[in-house]
Amino acid sequence: MKGPITFLLQLGAVYTSIASACKLSDLPILSAHGSYGSNQCIAFGGEQAVIDRLIDPQACDIPKLIEATADQLQDGLTKGCFTSVDLVKVRITLQTPYRQGNVLIIVVVQTYVARIAEVNSTVRAVTEINPDALTIAKQMDNERKMGKLRGPLHGLPIVIKNNIFTDDKMSSTAGSYAIFGARTSADATVATKLREAGLVIMGKSGASQWANFRSLNSTNGWSAYGGQVTAAYIKNQDPSGSSSGSGVASDLGLAFATLGTETSGSIVSPADKSNIVGLKPTVGLTSRRFVVPISERQDTVGPMARSVKDAAYLLQVIAGKDSNDNYTSAIPFDTIPDYVKACDINALKGKRIGVPRNVIKIFGSPQTVVDQFNQALAVMKKAGAIIVENTDFTSFAEFAQSPIPDDILYADSLTNLPAFFKQLKVNPHNITDLESLRRFTQHHRLEEYPSRDTARWDIALQKGIKNTDPKFWPMYQKNVKFGNEGGILGALRRHKLDAAVLPTDLSPYIPALIGSPIITVPMGVYPNGTKVNHDRELVTSGPGIPIGIGFMGDLWSEEKLIGLAYAFEQKTHARPKLKRFIQPKKEVKGIL
């Protein structure tokens, strides 16, 4: 076969975007830096680890990984029930040279990697695993043995969205072959913070290509590089996006937790559809250095986890100022709040919670969602919250008809993407701006153009307004009004609210405009009899699909929102009640 064929070791599920057209013997093995040589053992842990156990693992109360929390995993690690190596060990050996045309891959997978291998050919949540994961896990185990713990997440495996660059053997592609093989001079700041806290970056998650900012006729969770991500509650379920794989991986217990990114809904919406907690931080609370951008005004990096407390643990790690991202200089506190301590079951008591009903009325929401939302309000009221009705976003009707929010993203992308491409120390296809990116995409067959168009880029280039253009500032001021006085901030001030709530699928739009935070928590499920709708092959609505509730707050109010979300979560325990059509069966006990 002519041309480079990228063969990804997708966690036991061996496939690429073109794998269906190729036999296994046709495919060379490539890393981000080139092909592996003959008879080479890929360093996922070829040697046997020597593990010192403090107690008999069979005597341990080891949690099921689909619901395991950071505290439970850390307790097992501390007691010696299992090690970080146990959580990530995998060996992949290339036995016969490719040039002889007979490649045999033997995969020995354990625990999280085994879980990924069980389901990834169906859900495609993870694009690759870190060849150095075992080495890092061993290091964390050795530090633990010597009495050194870097923090409460020491030794826990995490998967991060593939638009977050890492300076290691993994690829960072934003789902596109245009920057496959591109390198930055260092890890993204959030990745550095994860490593410093002792987390094992085990792999990268699939996502909507270019964070859903390429096409108007593509599907959520699709990318040329990773294929089509699907969620786990109904076959071919739309995972939403753009942090699609991060949502699915967290839900299925394919890692302790995941990182996603959001411009408008890209954390909370896939979290909603995968029945997990998603926390979109205030823009500037977490660094975006070496994260593929859309908009400097709206992009943010945040945690996606199975519980509010685990999301709080992860936010604690990644939050903070970074001289390489000037938006973080706006952080108003010298010390990052204790987000984990904010997890208080009584946090709803006495809090004023607003309900902007006009958003539901204007955008519309299925009656079953409204009914379950009203039941959630009743739970909060019973927990001591003061529910304040009709705290409307006064400019929402105008916002819903305005092209300005999209125009801001078009202008930012025309400026921010070239600035990012300029930072690449390796840029294999010489992608320098949106025009060259579009040209590559339209001429590379793996990018599936024109069946998946480039309409968003076409519009941005046609408009030609960058965020440095004099025309930009008046547009931006109007946009800010939609989110500020006419949106969430105005509602909070007028009604003296601690937070506002909406069904999650209605919550992202206004906070996106001003960079304010949201946290989504599982709330319920679409019942039997729900009409099944499709977008191409994906099921966008139907029985069994999760429903979440979004808590929206003031800038820098994550501490308060986490408390409210935690109290609601503990009063409802909605997540464990839902059934999936697919989930992995491998557990820690099975490999000890």
Curated annotation (Swiss-Prot):
Q: Which residues bind substrate?
A: 242, 263-266
What are the catalytic residues?
161, 242, 266
**GO terms for MF:** hydrolase activity
Q: Which residues form the signal peptide?
A: 1-21
Q: Name one Pfam family in it.
A: Amidase
| Positions annotated with a glycan in the UniProt record | 120, 217, 326, 430, 528
What keywords are annotated for this sequence in UniProt? Glycoprotein, Hydrolase, Secreted, Signal
What are the EC numbers? 3.5.1.-
One GO cellular component this record assigns the protein to is: extracellular region
The listed locations are: Secreted
**Membership in a protein family:** Belongs to the amidase family.
Q: What is this protein called?
A: Putative amidase ARB_02965
